Amino acid sequence: MGVTCVSQMPVAEGKSVQQTVELLTRKLEMLGAEKQGTFCVDCETYHTAASTLGSQGQTGKLMYVMHNSEYPLSCFALFENGPCLIADTNFDVLMVKLKGFFQSAKASKIETRGTRYQYCDFLVKVGTVTMGPSARGISVEVEYGPCVVASDCWSLLLEFLQSFLGSHTPGAPAVFGNRHDAVYGPADTMVQYMELFNKIRKQQQVPVAGIR
């Protein structure tokens, strides 16, 4: 894999999530991007079981268990303000056995699904983010394949993002700053998705005006 940027695309004013996704994919197709199948990234939140906290008023920590269709044999466990564990798919079974330590938060499942597009050395994924039956937002992932060091290709990624996101082009992901000259890996992408999902969850708690 290469270096990846994950961002949120605001819903266009007067349009639905699905209509905005269609506008975005149409722009990509006009640029010459070709469809390359579908993708899915999902996330379920677990919190520390009350029985493990003791009586000192400790605050429970969160853990996010995630899957990415690009890595069908792997499961990612991201600890709140901590490391990312990459395990095999049996990790989900292990979480059931660990219910005395971690418990699944109610209605915490969030996922994004959509279409993959290939444009020269760029792989683009535009997805609809859903919680339960409802569409909550739009995710955009762009990967530049030939490079594995974020600082070496961010300007190129930025230029490509501007070509179809325009004024909604994101800034450099926080994970780039943490790993400026390090080799980029799948865990870095999952951290970005975790941050995106948490941002969208928070947006559901306050009314958001349409964006032109």
UniProtKB/Swiss-Prot annotation:
It is found in: Nucleus. One of its GO terms (molecular function) is DNA-directed RNA polymerase activity. Keywords: Activator, Nucleus, Transcription, Transcription regulation. Its main location: nucleus. GO terms for cellular component: core mediator complex; mediator complex; nucleoplasm; nucleus. One of its GO terms (biological process) is regulation of transcription by RNA polymerase II. Belongs to the Mediator complex subunit 20 family. Interacts with PPARG. Component of the Mediator complex, which is composed of MED1, MED4, MED6, MED7, MED8, MED9, MED10, MED11, MED12, MED13, MED13L, MED14, MED15, MED16, MED17, MED18, MED19, MED20, MED21, MED22, MED23, MED24, MED25, MED26, MED27, MED29, MED30, MED31, CCNC, CDK8 and CDC2L6/CDK11. The MED12, MED13, CCNC and CDK8 subunits form a distinct module termed the CDK8 module. Mediator containing the CDK8 module is less active than Mediator lacking this module in supporting transcriptional activation. Component of the Mediator complex, a coactivator involved in the regulated transcription of nearly all RNA polymerase II-dependent genes. Mediator functions as a bridge to convey information from gene-specific regulatory proteins to the basal RNA polymerase II transcription machinery. Mediator is recruited to promoters by direct interactions with regulatory proteins and serves as a scaffold for the assembly of a functional preinitiation complex with RNA polymerase II and the general transcription factors. This is Mediator of RNA polymerase II transcription subunit 20.
